[in-house]
A protein has these predicted regions:
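Generic structural signal for residues positioned in beta-strands
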Residues: 23-25, 40, 75, 207, ...
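Linear, non-domain "peripheral" regions
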Residues: 1-119, 182
Length: 272
């Protein structure tokens, strides 16, 4: 597929800010099944941008704005060519061993209910892609994805108890369940042409990768109950969403910050 992505973020501050610093994880990298043909980041005010990589190997951009500033708009646009890799992850920059991704975070702590689900599905058998897919399906059956962007951060255990959550919450539940039975697991942020948030244009997408010994990393999307294919664009990874969120940062100044996000993914039709 040839996909275009437009990710606009608008900040409005109730009081002028003396300085704004943002860490952007919004630039996808090339790997098997994904080629970035065009990508750019624009800001509607004077700003300094510095590209780099974080500890996970994600492409990053540091954004620095000196005030006073009362509003700003960040525009990320690009075009990505994707091929169907059947949910198998290859050719990515890997800076950390799979064992690192067995670490439990506050967002991905499994409670007794999540552990019981994982043990019922996976049991004590050898880890395999089939068991990982079965675990994804089990998580999909017990937590309903709610489209849209959410400001409230809840844990995997809370989302599991509620029985619904954002695509981020669905991913956190699968990560918690997978780690509970020994799978290295990580969260992926990116974009999806036909995901739960496609109609609302309100946020990017999240899914999960699990490591299978002898096979490598495989992609699983518990919000759609499928293995990501060529309608997905992979951008960043982390232990949980806090490590791979598209935007994070600080500001120097008082008042309230209002954020408006519009994300659109489109398929470029080709003649042939």
């Amino acid at each position: 597929m040839r996909l275009t992505i437009d990710h606009h973020t608008r900040y409005q501050f109730s009081e002028p800010q003396a300085r704004v610093v943002q860490l952007l994880r919004m630039t996808p990298a090339d790997h098997v099944g994904q080629t970035v043909s065009d990508w750019r980041i624009d800001v509607d005010c004077d700003a300094r941008l510095r590209d780099g990589r974080d500890g996970y190997g994600n492409l990053t951009t540091m954004l620095y704005i000196d005030g006073p500033i009362s509003a700003m708009e960040l525009m990320v646009r690009g075009e990505v060519l994707t091929d169907d890799s059947a949910g198998v992850v290859r050719g990515c920059t890997e800076t950390l061993p799979p064992l690192f991704f067995t670490r439990v975070t506050a967002q991905t702590q499994a409670d007794e209910a999540i552990m019981a689900l994982a043990e019922t599905v996976v049991g004590s058998g050898t880890h395999s892609a089939d068991r990982a897919v079965a675990l994804m399906a089990a998580v999909h059956d017990v937590i309903t994805p709610r489209p849209g962007r959410t400001e409230k951060t809840i844990t995997a255990a809370d989302a599991f108890a509620l029985g619904h959550g954002s695509v981020r919450d669905c991913a956190h539940v699968l990560i918690a369940a997978a780690r509970a039975v020994g799978y290295p697991a990580r969260l992926v942020s990116g974009h999806c042409l036909d995901g739960p948030n496609a109609a609302s244009h309100s946020s990017a997408h999240c899914w999960t990768e699990l490591y299978i010994e002898g096979e490598g990393w495989i992609s699983l999307d518990p919000s759609t109950n499928r293995r990501p294919r060529d309608s997905y664009v992979r951008v960043a990874i982390g232990l949980d969403a806090s490590d791979s969120t598209p935007l994070s940062g600080t500001r120097r100044g008082g008042g309230i910050e209002a954020l408006d996000v519009d994300v659109r993914v489109a398929l470029i039709q080709t003649q042939g």
